[in-house]
Amino acid sequence: MTSVPAGAISKRDNVVVFDTTMRDGEQSPGASMSLEEKLELAKILEEMGVDVIEAGFPIASNGDFEAVRQIAELITESTVCGLARAAAGDIDRCAEAVRRAKRGRIHTFISTSPVHMKYKLQMEPDAVLEAITRSVSHARNLVGDVEWSAEDATRTERDFLKRCVEAAIKAGATTINLPDTVGYSYPSEYGELFRDVITSVPGADKAIFSAHCHNDLGLAVANSIAAIEGGARQVEVAINGIGERAGNAALEEIVMALRVRGDHLPYGTSVDPVHITRASRYVSAITGFPVQFNKAIVGKNAFAHESGIHQDGMLKNAETYEIMKPEDVGQGATNLVMGKHSGRHAFREKLKALGYELGQNALNDAFGRFKELADKKKHVFDDDIVALVDDALARGSEKIRVSRLRVVAGTDGQSAELTLDIDGVASTAEATGDGPVDAVFNAIHKIVPHSAALRLFQVHAVTEGTDAQAQVSVRLEEDGRIATGAAADTDTLTASAKAYVNALNNLFARKEKSRPEAAIASGF
């Protein structure tokens, strides 16, 4: 079965795609992103055609406020949204953050389930209703686009939920979100919830209804699709499905489910899926969260066929075992071989096919790094090129660079001699360790003393073969600050050194820019 052409679905039938990778996605333990990484991700999301970018929770910290503010100034096509509790201070801070957005939105929420009202809010239902009216009205006086969410909607008493929705719409909410906050619902009951609320609440036709599903039972995507069947016209999603606990509904899965199965649900999205793989890999690189090999749409094996019977069918007609083309999501039709004899024009066209449009300086830099890699490898595959470019994108401020590394390993121990370039000045140190990687990291510590603790060290081969590139992710933590670094190289130890140094660069940049923060976590 082939995908429905993007132009076959009219704009009025589109489902609004609301991306919360930088807000709910960042609430995944260890998934903290720097300001520079968020700005780059925002550009990727806008280029993809994402309708709404939830850029952060402005009252939570100065860092979140600044991210929302700068993204609001940067983005011109997508709506930029900030999150706020049902409190005037939250809403005012959010309004200030999105003030310069061409299209700005305030997303305010309050819990509505009995367990949340009793134990979390310690509020009576009537007080919650008053808070909804007060907060939504206040937000609507500041911006024209206000979303209201009933936190823990799927465990809320139905009649009370309808009263809350009616109050929010009367107060001026333009979008109503009914989140499955704890991933509790089944698709049939979640779809029925939307049908019931939309058909029975007065004024429901004045608002767009939205689904926000968590994946605690592995049903986030199925529930989101069921909500669309029930009348929802916005879905709240995250790249790679990252988010609190088991994560959110995955953007890539919902977008492609709607595109491939247009015969079942005649609704499209504004997202150009050719950018999906690039976005997935970038988010994986900056968070250090690997994408499982069998992950739908973006996993390494999503378009792999090993069975002889399957391969035979694919050679005769790809539709025998593929319901979409890998090119549709930016994975490239085949692993075309690129090598040291490939020219700049071929390299540029390959980047375009993989979803990258680089400026001339960035292209020249990437091409030079590609030629260096091609001299080390017999064949350079699509995944090698993606890792090479994403490695450059993932790097933050580069005050420190790896200049030279020599490792000696033997039965009597391992030692590393490392030279780092720090603001143009070379510094060299030797160190031993419990293994070659430990020796390399100890050498870095000798040159750049720090108190950061290593929280993650992860290595995987980008492609197959003994000359495959190693992609390394490192996560450091110091005084509550978390920084991630990623690097790729044909030599695992060199990649490890570069990843550690990239993490240090990001950590030091974050320390320089940090101000006192009040960490406030949102529930859904």
From Swiss-Prot:
Homodimer. GO terms for molecular function: 2-isopropylmalate synthase activity; acetyl-CoA C-acetyltransferase activity; manganese ion binding. The keyword Manganese applies. The gene is leuA. It is found in: Cytoplasm. GO terms for biological process: L-leucine biosynthetic process. It comes from the Bacteria. Pfam families: HCS_D2, HMGL-like, LeuA_dimer. Its EC number is 2.3.3.13. Residues 401-524 are annotated as: Regulatory domain. Belongs to the alpha-IPM synthase/homocitrate synthase family. LeuA type 1 subfamily. Catalyzes the condensation of the acetyl group of acetyl-CoA with 3-methyl-2-oxobutanoate (2-ketoisovalerate) to form 3-carboxy-3-hydroxy-4-methylpentanoate (2-isopropylmalate). Keywords: Amino-acid biosynthesis, Branched-chain amino acid biosynthesis, Cytoplasm, Leucine biosynthesis, Manganese, Metal-binding, Transferase. Mn(2+) binds at D24, H212, H214, N248. Pathway: Amino-acid biosynthesis; L-leucine biosynthesis; L-leucine from 3-methyl-2-oxobutanoate: step 1/4. It comes from Caulobacter vibrioides (strain NA1000 / CB15N). This is 2-isopropylmalate synthase. SUPFAM superfamilies: 2-isopropylmalate synthase LeuA, allosteric (dimerisation) domain (SSF110921), Aldolase (SSF51569).
